[in-house]
């Protein structure tokens, strides 16, 4: 049995990711999001809201020369993210900030970023203590105790440059809510991918990209399947991890 706070190391596409078992560990949704985000040569500044152990920032650093900032509220988690950045030699392009994104107007400038990404807390918290984990730090990563999706969208709209992109991953049952929030804050939904555990199943996750002050036009891209007909991880998923899983 592992001790509380024990560290593990996971290999992801050639990178070594340090995690702690008493904090929310990265999962497939973060890996999917990191690979969903579109980056081009004009992308100079990227913000990763709620960076956790830094995995999304690390994925983006492998495919971009942009300046990446990951902001994380939980101090211990931000320390792990810094270690991951240093372990994988991305300290020249990734900066980790331990702060509350709600202080955005004191930390960042309006219209500062070309790209903003987030893997937000998925679940609403209504004050019912039975909803949450015994470990407060994990509950804060899974439930919107500290911040809501609407607050994240509103803040991102403020920080994005005109025609900048905002990408997020979320549970499929919140799709209507998320699309409504994006348009409310002038982030025009442009493309989406659905993720299924297997064929014949309902979608579990959605990945959406929205562009600030863009014209209308929406594309639903080819779906992602996690498992094939034999119950094995699909080649697409194996490729994301860079190894047999």
Residue ranges and their predicted role:
Residues 1-15, 105-111, 242-245:
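Short, Lys/Arg-enriched, disordered terminal segments
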Residues 2-40:
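Class I SAM-dependent transferase core
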Residues 16-17, 22, 145-203:
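Conserved Class I SAM-dependent methyltransferase catalytic core
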Residues 35-129, 154:
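Conserved SAM/SAH cofactor-binding pocket of Class I
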Residues 122-151:
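Mobile active-site "lid"/loop adjacent to the S-adenosyl-L-methionine
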Residues 201-245:
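SAM/dcSAM-binding transferase cores
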């Amino acid at each position: 049995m592992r001790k509380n706070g024990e560290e593990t190391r996971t290999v992801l596409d050639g990178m070594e990711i340090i995690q702690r078992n008493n904090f929310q560990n990265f999962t497939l949704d973060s890996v999917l999001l990191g690979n969903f985000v579109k980056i081009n040569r004009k992308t100079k500044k990227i913000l990763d809201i709620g960076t956790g152990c830094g995995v999304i920032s690390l994925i983006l650093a492998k495919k971009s020369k942009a300046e990446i900032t990951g902001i994380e509220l939980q101090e211990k988690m931000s320390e792990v993210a810094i270690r991951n950045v240093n372990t994988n030699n991305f300290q020249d392009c990734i900066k980790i900030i331990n702060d509350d994104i709600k202080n955005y107007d004191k930390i960042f400038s309006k219209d500062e970023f070309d790209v903003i990404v987030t893997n937000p807390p998925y679940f609403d918290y209504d004050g019912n203590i039975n909803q949450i984990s015994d470990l407060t730090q994990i509950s804060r990563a899974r439930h919107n105790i500290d911040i809501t999706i609407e607050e994240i969208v509103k803040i991102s709209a403020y920080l994005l440059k005109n025609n900048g992109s905002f990408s997020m991953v979320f549970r499929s049952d919140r799709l209507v809510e998320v699309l409504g929030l994006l348009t409310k804050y002038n982030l025009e939904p442009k493309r989406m991918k659905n993720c299924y555990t297997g064929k014949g199943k309902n979608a579990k996750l959605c990945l959406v990209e929205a562009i600030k002050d863009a014209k209308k036009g929406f594309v639903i891209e080819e779906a992602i399947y996690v498992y094939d007909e034999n119950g094995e991880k699909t080649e697409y998923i194996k490729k994301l991890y860079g190894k047999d899983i």
